């Protein structure tokens, strides 16, 4: 079942769902909007082959910057970048979050691959952004993502306790 604005407010009021900071315009009709933070990471086109079984070195594969909210960050045509949300989101054991880009940004040609926030997860959300056919400037603080919460039929037996639990900022891959 997809939660309505009233359901989301109830979960937050009871302390079961945490979104921090929670602004007045965060809760929408059937989900929440999350804002872009100021950190963006570009993939380094000159990086060597990435071996997914070896430790990942962020400095080799990404060029990360903190951007001024007034200057923004330009996503180049068809470029893939990583970003993160300003908000920390903590889900209880009976909610799953389905993340998508807000339709305004989709209409600009921006794409975000489907992302799931697992039941029991707590942290900022790292997302991949794929650029449009033309450069698009994004700004920290913009409501960029929409998260729809789905209630599971029963609380999950094994809430998320994985390698990304508690992540802050843009979090690179952590090989198994």
UniProtKB/Swiss-Prot annotation:
SUPFAM superfamilies: dUTPase-like. It comes from the Archaea. The active site is at residue 128. Keywords: Hydrolase, Nucleotide metabolism, Nucleotide-binding. It catalyses: dCTP + H2O + H(+) = dUTP + NH4(+). It is an enzyme of class 3 (hydrolase). GO terms for biological process: dUMP biosynthetic process; dUTP biosynthetic process. Pathway: Pyrimidine metabolism; dUMP biosynthesis; dUMP from dCTP (dUTP route): step 1/2. The keyword Magnesium does not apply. Its EC number is 3.5.4.13. One of its GO terms (molecular function) is nucleotide binding. The keyword Hydrolase applies. Coiled coil: none annotated. DCTP binds at residues 102-107, 118, 160, 167. Signal peptide: none annotated. It holds the Pfam family DCD. Catalyzes the deamination of dCTP to dUTP. Homotrimer. Belongs to the dCTP deaminase family. This is dCTP deaminase. It comes from Hyperthermus butylicus (strain DSM 5456 / JCM 9403 / PLM1-5). The gene is dcd.
């Amino acid at each position: 079942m997809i939660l309505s604005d009233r359901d989301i407010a109830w979960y937050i009021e009871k302390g079961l769902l945490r979104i921090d900071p929670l602004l007045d315009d965060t809760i929408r009709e059937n989900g929440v909007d999350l804002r872009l933070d100021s950190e963006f990471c570009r993939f380094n086109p000159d990086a060597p082959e990435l071996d997914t079984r070896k430790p990942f070195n962020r400095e080799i594969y990404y060029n990360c910057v903190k951007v001024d909210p007034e200057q923004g960050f330009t996503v180049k045509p068809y470029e893939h970048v990583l970003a993160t949300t300003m908000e920390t989101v903590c889900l209880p054991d009976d909610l799953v979050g389905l993340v998508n880009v807000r339709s305004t940004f989709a209409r600009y040609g921006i794409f975000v691959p489907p992302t799931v926030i697992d039941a029991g997860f707590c942290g900022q959300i790292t997302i991949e952004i794929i650029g449009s056919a033309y450069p698009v400037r994004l700004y920290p603080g913009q409501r960029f993502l929409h998260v729809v919460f789905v209630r599971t039929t029963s609380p999950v037996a094994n809430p998320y306790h994985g390698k990304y639990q508690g992540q802050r900022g843009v979090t690179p891959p952590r090989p198994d």
